[in-house]
C-alpha cells in the first residue's frame, strides 16, 4: 500500500524552510493548509500530483510517506523531498525494514516506480472485483474518487496492457483533481486552501463545490 521512508536525526527544520528548498530545487510545490502545530505536512506539485506526499515529524526524525495509486509526479516529488530533507537535517535514511538507503534515486529508480504504479493499478482492479464491481473510494489531493467497473469501462481500458491502462487512469485521476474541481477565484466558499510558498493571497487556489 503506502511506502514509508524514515529520516533518522535529532535535528529539526521549519516547515517553511524545507518547502522553500524543495520548491527552489525541484518544481512549484503547493502545500495543503495545515495548522502550524500539526506534525504532518501534505503537499504536491501543482497540476501534476494525484495524491501528493506526507512528511511527518516523529521522535526519531521524520517520516516521508507516499500512498497507493500515486503517480510519477508524486514519486518524483517524494524522492526529491527525501533527498533534500535528509541533507537539511543531516539524517540517515531507512526503509520500513530498517535497512539503510544510501541513494533514494537508485533504490527507487524509474523502472521500479513504473512497476509500483502498474502493481497498484492491478491491485485496485482486484479490489473492485472483490467488491463485486462496487466503487472503491480513493482520495486525491482534494477530493475522493470513486473507482469501479463503470469507470474502467468508461475509460475503455479493460483490454489494454496494464502499463498503458494505468497511464490513462492516472490522467483521468489528474483531471479529476485539478481541471474540474480547482478554480482560481476570490471570495469563494472553500473547503481546502492551497497557496504557493511565498505567494500572496490573490494567487491562492481554492477547492469549492
Q: What residue spans do the PLM features occupy?
A:
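Short, flexible beta-strand-to-coil junctions
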Residues: 10-12, 67-73, 87, 186, ...
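Short, intrinsically disordered low-complexity segments
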Residues: 23-74
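Conserved short beta-strand edge segments in small beta-sheet-based binding/regulatory domains
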Residues: 31-34, 89-97
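Aromatic/basic-lined ligand-recognition segments
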Residues: 108-209
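Amphipathic alpha-helical segments
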Residues: 9-31, 77-87
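Short, highly charged C-terminal tails/helix-capping segments
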Residues: 93-117
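Short glycine-/aliphatic-rich beta-strand segments at the starts of folded cytosolic domains
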Residues: 1-10, 61-65
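A short, compositionally biased
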Residues: 1, 40, 86-89
